[in-house]
């Protein structure tokens, strides 16, 4: 069985397209879909109950955040394979079947994602990432990565120097689509939880990828197939607030995994503060008021 876990937050407008794109049977396996709704008052629950009665709908008592809600959905799931999926995605059966077959026949793969394509046809760069070095982070914040996207010296953060249609191992993938075996998620879990609930919204996917890799598994991007990611529909659009939240969450991931010494903690705090301030300074110069895809 494949279990699909979706965390919804003010997702009434896009959840229908997401659920409508999901099969109930895939490669001979039954598919169960679980929606954990962090904002049950927006009407998404009524839509799901009326149009998708096969979906297991869980109304959260409050906004649990991304990681905690995913953990609740995971606990309710039964599948040998589990897909964590965003509500602002539109999937297709060939892409799902391809990724599932790759996972089924290669036990070294811990997590896999297809290419994620945005509404304008461009690639969602966050669907394949490195575990960035300090230099990679500076290049992205300072705009060098976007200015020289095909140069490996500057493009290490989002790996834009690699072919979009290729298949290769990466450092991290996006929480919008994370497919893995239950045995892998259980092996990478901390205190019985797949996602670290200290990360309310951002950084949790990076943290999980690091733990899966530490458990001895590969993180794979397969660009031969693609799904649509209507990025940002379920989150706030204020550039400053979101940028600060992303940088601060990723800083905390680095402190968790790489900040064993006082010197390392000082280094990462300083680096992430610099990256955040440089990125916000560039945004103000360009007059951004809405979130750019990253």
Task: Give the positions of each predicted feature.
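A short, conserved alpha-helix in the catalytic core of glycosyltransferases
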Residues: 163-226
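Short aromatic/hydrophobic "clamp" motif used to bind/position activated sugar donors
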Residues: 82
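A conserved acidic beta->alpha catalytic loop
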Residues: 21, 37-46, 62, 92
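Conserved donor NDP-sugar-binding/catalytic core segment of glycosyltransferases
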Residues: 90-126
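Active-site-adjacent helix/loop segment of glycosyltransferases
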Residues: 210-292
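Short, acidic, metal-binding catalytic loop of nucleotide-sugar glycosyltransferases
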Residues: 20-30
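Short, flexible, basic/aromatic active-site loop/helix in glycosyltransferases
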Residues: 131-170
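Glycine-rich, basic loop-to-helix element that forms the pyrophosphate-binding segment
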Residues: 59-77
């Amino acid at each position: 069985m494949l279990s699909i876990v979706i965390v919804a937050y003010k997702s009434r407008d896009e959840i229908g397209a997401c659920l409508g794109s999901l099969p109930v049977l895939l490669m001979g396996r039954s598919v169960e879909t679980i929606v954990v709704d962090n904002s049950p008052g927006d009407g998404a629950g009524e839509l799901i109950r009326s149009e998708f009665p096969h979906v297991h709908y869980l109304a959260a008592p409050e906004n649990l955040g991304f990681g905690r809600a995913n953990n609740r959905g995971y606990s309710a799931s039964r599948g040998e394979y589990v897909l964590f999926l965003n509500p602002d995605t539109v999937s297709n059966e060939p892409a799902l079947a391809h990724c599932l077959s790759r996972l089924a026949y290669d036990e070294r793969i811990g997590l896999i994602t297809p290419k994620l394509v945005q509404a304008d046809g461009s690639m969602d760069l966050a669907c394949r990432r490195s575990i960035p070095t300090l230099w990679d982070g500076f290049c992205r914040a300072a705009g060098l990565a976007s200015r020289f996207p095909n140069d490996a010296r500057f493009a290490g953060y989002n790996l834009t120097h690699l072919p979009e249609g290729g298949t290769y191992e990466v450092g991290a993938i996006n929480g919008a689509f994370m497919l893995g075996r239950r045995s892998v998620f259980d092996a990478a879990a901390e205190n019985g939880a797949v996602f670290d609930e200290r990360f309310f919204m951002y950084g949790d996917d990076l943290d999980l990828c690091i733990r899966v890799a530490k458990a001895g598994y590969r993180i794979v991007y397969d660009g031969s197939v693609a799904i649509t990611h209507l990025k940002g529909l379920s989150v706030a659009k204020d550039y400053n607030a979101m940028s600060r939240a992303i940088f601060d969450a990723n800083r905390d991931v680095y402190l968790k995994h790489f900040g064993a010494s006082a010197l390392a903690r000082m280094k990462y705090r300083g680096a992430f503060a610099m990256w955040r301030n440089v990125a916000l300074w560039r945004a103000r110069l360009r007059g951004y008021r809405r979130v750019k895809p990253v």
